[in-house]
């Protein structure tokens, strides 16, 4: 939905709109263009896409985009950014383009049950595991680790000069 809103906003500003959907490889690429029909196609592709693969390789997607875009562009990256950032590839992209990172978060991932056994599934790999939370200290440790990872991510984006928005 965020991608659709951005596409309509760019179209209203008379900017070209393109799309790259990726997992471990680029699954869908739509060259930038103007026009209502084009934007509607991009929105349809965003909302109707079902990934063929799991995982996500931001480095590979950025390399693909850098080869595709010869002119300076605005690149909006929508991701959860849970995997380590490809710093050198982002630096290259930042030198040539205006890069904005929009981090999509899930409120359910920010909550844990008070105590007990929980089953977790990695959405990208499909791997399933169980964790037993025995006390509040384990829950506090989980949230501390998440907060530290988020702080590190924000520091990396700031160091790269990339605007970062968390939704």
Short names for language-model regions:
Residues 1-36, 64, 74-77, 83-85, ...:
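An amphipathic, basic-hydrophobic helix/alpha-beta surface used to engage anionic
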Residues 27-32, 40-46, 129:
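Mobile active-site "lid"/loop adjacent to the S-adenosyl-L-methionine
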Residues 36-39, 55, 139, 150:
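Alpha-helix initiation and N-capping motif
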Residues 38-73, 85, 104-108:
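Von Willebrand factor
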Residues 53, 81, 144-145:
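Residues that cap or flank secondary-structure elements
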Residues 67-73, 85-167:
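Von Willebrand factor type A / integrin I
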Residues 78-79, 102:
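Short His-Asn-centered micro-motif
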């Amino acid at each position: 939905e965020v991608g659709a809103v951005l596409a309509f906003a760019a179209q209203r500003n008379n900017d070209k709109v393109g799309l790259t959907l990726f997992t471990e490889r680029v699954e869908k690429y739509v060259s930038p263009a103007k026009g209502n029909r084009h934007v509607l196609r991009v929105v349809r592709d965003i909302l109707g896409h079902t990934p063929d693969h799991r995982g996500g390789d931001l480095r590979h997607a950025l390399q693909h985009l850098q080869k595709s875009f010869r002119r300076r562009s605005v690149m909006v990256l929508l991701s959860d950014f849970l995997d380590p950032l490809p710093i050198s590839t982002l630096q290259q992209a930042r030198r040539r383009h205006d890069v904005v990172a929009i981090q999509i978060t899930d409120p359910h991932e920010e909550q844990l049950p008070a105590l007990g056994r929980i089953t977790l599934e990695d959405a990208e790999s499909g791997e399933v595991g169980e964790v037993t939370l025995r006390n509040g200290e384990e829950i506090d440790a989980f949230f501390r680790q998440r907060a530290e990872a988020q702080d590190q991510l924000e520091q990396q984006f700031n160091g790269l000069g990339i605007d970062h928005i968390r939704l």
